[in-house]
Amino acid sequence: KKKKKLIVLETDLRTPEDKAWFQDNLIDKVKTPWILSKFEKQAEETHQKLAMINQSLNNAKASIGNLSFATPVMKTDFGADLYTVSDVEASEVLSSMRETFKNKALMLDFWATWCGPCLKDFPSSKKIHAEVKDEPVEFIYLCSSNGSTEEEWKQRIAEFQLDGTHLYVDEKIEAELMTMFDSRGGFPTYAFINKSGAYKPGAVSRMAALDRGQFVNLIHGK
């Protein structure tokens, strides 16, 4: 029963900082040598990840931003532009994104910091983004404020070193945007708009399922 309780607690941890605190406290209570060795290794890996996150956030610069509907937060050294979005109509957010990234396709990723499937898909998103760097497409990640703090949002972006445009969006605006795309599936939700401005329902269900050839065809409306 005690073991089960510890597992539940660890899976509920929100950020690497929370996980490091949990592991540090757990190590003091472990007496079995091989288990202790395992936890010490995990704790070391977590602290290394936490150090990387903090370094990335500390190295981030102030951003003047280029989105009329959003407040700029920072620009990281790994290519992420962070903004907050509130007190604006969802329709304005969408139209302004189209105007800002004119002649580009938009890959919209609706997510939350507590969403396991969202986080699991991030490495695939980062991979396909790198593969289409030479293509006219903007990756825009919209994190809901529902259950996600701004600090958790920043830490998740730094944890995955996820470049692109990142929006921390008021939950009501995010819900309205998702409704505009007829989404009923919760997080993650993906919406794709090709470079001609046409929304393609169901074009992307999982980032892990995309390959470069498929995605390039989507971008150009083929």
Q: Can you describe what each PLM-predicted range is?
A:
Residues 102, 110-127, 144, 148:
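Conserved redox-active cysteine motifs that mediate thiol-disulfide chemistry
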Residues 74, 130-174, 181-184:
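Conserved segment of the thioredoxin-like fold in thiol-based oxidoreductases
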Residues 104-105, 122-143, 158, 213, ...:
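Conserved helix-turn-beta segment immediately C-terminal to the redox Cys motif
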Residues 162, 169-220:
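Thiol/disulfide oxidoreductase modules built on the thioredoxin-like
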Residues 1-104:
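Oxidative protein folding and maturation machinery
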Residues 59-61, 66-67, 72, 122, ...:
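C-terminal structured domains
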Residues 91, 95-98, 126-129, 150, ...:
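Extracytoplasmic/secreted envelope proteins and their assembly/folding machinery
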Residues 105-106, 188:
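Alpha/beta-hydrolase fold active-site loops
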